[in-house]
Amino acid sequence: MLSELGFPGLLVGFALACEQFVAPSRVLFGQISDAHPLAQRHRVPYVLLGTALFCSLAVLSVPLIFRVGSLLQAGIQPALGLAIAALCGLFGLYGLAISLATTPYLALVIDRTTEAERPRAVGIIWCLLTVGIVIGAVLISTSLRDLDGITDPAVLEPALTAFMLRVALAVFAITVAATWAMEPPALGRRASGVGPREDGVTLAQAWTLIRSSPQVLIFFSFLILFTLALFLQDPVLESYAAQVFGMPIAATAQLNAFWGVGTLLGLLVAGVWVVPSMGKLGAARLGCRLIAASLLMLLLCGLTASVPLLKVVMVLFGLAAGIGTNSALCLMLDLTLPEVAGTFVGVWGLAQALSRALGKVVGGGLLDLGRLLSGSAAGHSPNPFPAYALVLGVEFVVALGALLLLDRVNVHQFREDTGRSLDQVLVAESL
């Protein structure tokens, strides 16, 4: 959209952010999957429905994007405004479909595992997710190689539409295969043997459960700070490597690969060894400390402008992120009730989605503020490092804030509060 079609950066950013703006729907979809089974199943039908919807919307996005591009070139009003609104609306619907697919999926992980099994299950799931992203990126890059250098919309649109259709069909087929026989018919019991799911819990009652324990707000706030500590630097990392370390564009793009390798190792190590040996809270504390230390190293290595050191730090940062992510996800899955697992997963997913969106905005805003304060924006200072140091410094403080909040998380207190509230809800419903 930015290069071939010449879309304004603000338009691209806002359209993509529309996917995050609908994040509150995760709570609703989680509660719906708790209370309303489809085809006698609470999770898999919603996963398949959401997948079918976001695959269809992905295919529809291609002609709409090219339509907006042609109207931008022609400057036709008011058709351009309507097309932009339609594009933003489509990305919003795409976000709804993603929420519909992913929230019941995470609830299914809770339904199908015990507390002891979850660290390893989470590690395997997120490792395979990372591997899948890498394989998908390689396959997409290889498949679109013939389109390199082509900017003619008349050639690009039919080629990309056909390509997206093939990808959508493949994604849906893989999803069907992956979820086949993963959920038994809803007989009112979880696969792990915990008691019946109460289909009568309404959205209002679920909201009562969410507000019943201060631990919900504490962990919600922790997830926001933790996710910000991971991704606040994301929108400025490549420019940090280019301007401070003098790396070429192709090399800066490879930094994500170093981070990804570290994350993969961290997820495996956490799932197999760290979480089982230290416990979920202990592993989460270790992850937060390692993330804070990695951010400090990322800041300090900018003083040396050493590219090899930067690559090592990115691997260490990924390792810390993997350990922290695994333990935080295990905590997230523990801080639920079996009867309303989807609802609580939706709440935690909302925290993560909001913080990812906030990270994109705040990261870029802090960089602009740093440039303004250091004078580099006006050309008064030739040194770009102080502006990036502000971003990384704030991110370091955010990681420490997440660590402090983590000390207040109490899984036992959460279960006691929400369990008592659930009993009251069910008693009131039976009267």
Q: PLM features: residue spans?
A:
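A late C-terminal transmembrane helix in Major Facilitator Superfamily
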Residues: 341-372
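Intracellular juxtamembrane helix-capping segments at the cytosolic ends
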Residues: 100-113, 323-337
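Intracellular loop-helix junctions on the cytosolic face of multi-pass helical membrane proteins
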Residues: 78-89, 96, 100-101, 105-106, ...
